[in-house]
């Protein structure tokens, strides 16, 4: 069993369902300290965070990832117990194999080989690991980045180990992500009997025209890197469940996935203008999950493309598709941020797995990035 596979298995065996870390970060620190890393706990609330750094000079290259995993779901449906890693027919099974304990293990073994080779990096090496990526993502990477900023520490290049690949390791690298803005619209009405609508005020009827306008609006045209901004209604709640009662209140939750062509403030203003135009009696509560970010070019992109080509034979596709990641908290500091990790076909599913050999491939790619960026 390779060192990367062995470490990934040891991490999977720790039942670190978000926001728990279950000793994963302690295990990582034990591997990093002998390499010369200063390992600092930046815990916040229930969340465990590890900031490990080797060197004091810039530029700073950082691997970023998480040790928490989503719940396994019905464990009886798993081929093997989700927290008992098993390699079967070349596949490593276990919750977190792809998302993202395999990547975290590859970070460490890439660093071990790189430093064992006698390399003297032109700058500092760092790891930022949290147990709050799969949860609210408030007390994890966001908190660590704020702490580093207060101390005057910055990250120049950041490689996030999210499972970016689709068919084979390294076929897709994420160079950015769309922003995510949530809204909860509450429309007030007057409850009443459906037979006497003149004595009531139906908030559903009030809201229909405004909602239709929001759904059909073209928010922007996108650009070379991002598709047009998307508006999706995710939940609609109204009424008591009875068929003869006009509801007194309507609640609609919705989400924008937005490009760099528009800001969260602009979207909020445009939505509120639509509601005002339709005279709705209500309010909106907004929640910004993250701004869009893009690293379209630069040293990190070039080094990653070259490392993937060296190890895999073909250059990666550069993409901004998919959901949000913790890269959204690091990019606003000015860092170049990319995401590169295992194949994502089974993430969050029963029987999550990766090809065992892929983790060694990933570790070699990570080592190649280090060599090209830091010498």
Swiss-Prot record:
UniProt entry tagged with the keyword Zinc: yes
Cofactor(s), by name: Zn(2+); Co(2+)
SUPFAM superfamilies: Bacterial exopeptidase dimerisation domain, Zn-dependent exopeptidases
Binding-site residues for Zn(2+) 2, renumbered to this chain: 99, 134, 348
Stored Pfam families: M20_dimer, Peptidase_M20
Cofactor note: Binds 2 Zn(2+) or Co(2+) ions per subunit.
Binding site for Zn(2+) 1: 66, 99, 162
Keyword Zinc on entry: yes
GO biological process per UniProt: diaminopimelate biosynthetic process; L-arginine biosynthetic process; lysine biosynthetic process via diaminopimelate
UniProt protein name: Succinyl-diaminopimelate desuccinylase
Organism from which the protein derives: Alkalilimnicola ehrlichii (strain ATCC BAA-1101 / DSM 17681 / MLHE-1)
Biological classification of the source: Bacteria, Pseudomonadati, Pseudomonadota, Gammaproteobacteria, Chromatiales
């Amino acid at each position: 069993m390779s060192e990367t596979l062995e470490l990934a298995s040891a991490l999977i065996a720790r039942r670190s369902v978000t926001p728990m870390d279950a000793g994963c970060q302690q295990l990582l620190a034990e591997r990093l300290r002998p390499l010369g890393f200063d390992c600092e706990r930046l815990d916040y609330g229930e969340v465990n965070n590890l900031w490990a750094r080797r060197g004091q000079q810039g530029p700073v290259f950082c691997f970023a990832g998480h040790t928490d995993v989503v719940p396994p779901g019905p464990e009886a449906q798993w081929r093997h117990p989700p927290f008992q890693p098993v390699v079967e027919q070349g596949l490593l099974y276990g919750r977190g194999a792809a998302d993202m304990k395999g990547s975290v293990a590859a970070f460490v073994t890439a660093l071990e080989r790189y430093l064992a080779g006698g390399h003297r990096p032109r700058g500092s090496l760092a790891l930022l690991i949290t147990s709050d990526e799969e949860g609210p993502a408030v007390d994890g990477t966001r908190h660590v980045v704020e702490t580093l900023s207060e101390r005057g520490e910055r990250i120049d290049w950041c490689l996030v180990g999210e499972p970016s690949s689709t068919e084979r390791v390294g076929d897709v690298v994420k160079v950015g992500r769309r922003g995510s803005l949530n809204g909860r619209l509450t429309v007030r009405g007057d409850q009443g009997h459906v037979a006497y609508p003149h004595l009531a005020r139906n908030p559903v009827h009030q809201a229909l025209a405004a909602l239709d306008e929001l759904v059909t609006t073209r928010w922007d045209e996108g650009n070379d890197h991002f598709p047009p901004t998307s508006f999706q209604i995710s939940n609609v709640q109204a009424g008591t469940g009875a068929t003869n009662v006009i509801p007194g209140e309507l609640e609609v939750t919705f989400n924008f996935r937005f490009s760099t062509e528009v800001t969260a403030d602009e979207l909020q203003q445009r939505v509120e203008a639509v509601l005002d135009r339709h005279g709705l009696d209500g309010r909106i509560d907004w929640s910004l999950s993250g701004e869009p970010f893009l690293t379209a070019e630069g040293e990190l992109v070039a080094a990653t493309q070259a490392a993937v080509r060296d190890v895999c034979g073909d250059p990666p596709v550069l993409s901004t598709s998919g959901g949000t990641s913790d890269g959204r908290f690091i990019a606003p500091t000015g860092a170049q941020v990319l995401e590169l990790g295992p194949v994502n076909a089974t993430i969050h599913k029963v029987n999550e797995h990766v090809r065992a050999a892929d983790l060694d491939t990933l570790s070699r790619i990570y080592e190649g990035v280090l060599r090209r960026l830091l010498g």
